[in-house]
Amino acid sequence: MSPPDPQQRRIGILGGTFNPVHHGHLIMAEQALWQFNLDQVLWMPAGDPPHKPLAAGASKADRLAMVKLAIADHERFACSDLEIRRPGPSYTIETLRSLMQEQPDTQWYWIIGVDALRDLPQWYQAEELARLCHWIVAPRIDAGDAAQVLRSVAAKLPIRAAILDAPTLTLSSTYLRQQIQKGGSIRYLVPPAVEHYIRQHRLYLDP
């Protein structure tokens, strides 16, 4: 990555469906915040993700509310409803352009899991998107070697990226939804406020 401009704020964007948000997301955001000296991590729940179908069980409003609950006690985490409000597919490049227009004196870092990074060359306007920001790649134990995936993507796109040094968890939103559907426990897998919201609103009970 190029040297940071000391005059610019450094904001990381963590996008995802957060269906539901869990401690793996929080660990990723916290480690990115400190390892890359970010001023803030902006959480960006997807409205209608174009690259994968959105699993049922929670509305856009529910997913947004759960993220807000999960990060409520962190002074350097913030949540945006930009993609939730915007009609149509939630294209990352449109989100990034909007943020850059609103805050032109900011250096942007997109936090992405290695599983999503593998598909980045197929994303909408991928080449321009790769150029617009820095990329922080979070490893996953079930998604292959992060360095190898990054080399493969860098051969196709002009990407400036670094790999996050963080625990490689297998925890996923899919697993949590399955646990809830079969009446299992999600205690310690999500923040208590998120678990309470899920139980109170009876989310993810139907397969």
Curated annotation (Swiss-Prot):
| CDD domains cross-referenced by the UniProt entry | NMNAT
Functionally, this protein is described as follows: Catalyzes the reversible adenylation of nicotinate mononucleotide (NaMN) to nicotinic acid adenine dinucleotide (NaAD).
Q: What is this protein called?
A: Probable nicotinate-nucleotide adenylyltransferase
What's the EC number here? 2.7.7.18
Q: What is the top-level taxon of the source organism?
A: Bacteria
User: Is Flavoprotein there in the keyword field?
Assistant: no
By sequence similarity, the record places it as follows: Belongs to the NadD family.
Q: Which reaction does it catalyse?
A: nicotinate beta-D-ribonucleotide + ATP + H(+) = deamido-NAD(+) + diphosphate
**What GO biological process term is on the record, naming one?**
NAD biosynthetic process
Q: Name one Pfam family in it.
A: CTP_transf_like
Cystine pairings recorded for this chain: none
| Catalytic EC class | transferase
Q: List the source organism.
A: Synechococcus sp. (strain JA-3-3Ab) (Cyanobacteria bacterium Yellowstone A-Prime)
- Sorted alphabetically, which InterPro entries does this protein's record hold? Cyt_trans-like, NadD/NMNAT, Rossmann-like_a/b/a_fold
Which Gene Ontology molecular function entries are recorded, alphabetically?
A: ATP binding; nicotinate-nucleotide adenylyltransferase activity
Protein keywords? ATP-binding, NAD, Nucleotide-binding, Nucleotidyltransferase, Pyridine nucleotide biosynthesis, Transferase
What PANTHER family would the database entry show? NICOTINATE-NUCLEOTIDE ADENYLYLTRANSFERASE-RELATED, PHOSPHOPANTETHEINE ADENYLYLTRANSFERASE
The biological pathway it contributes to is: Cofactor biosynthesis; NAD(+) biosynthesis; deamido-NAD(+) from nicotinate D-ribonucleotide: step 1/1
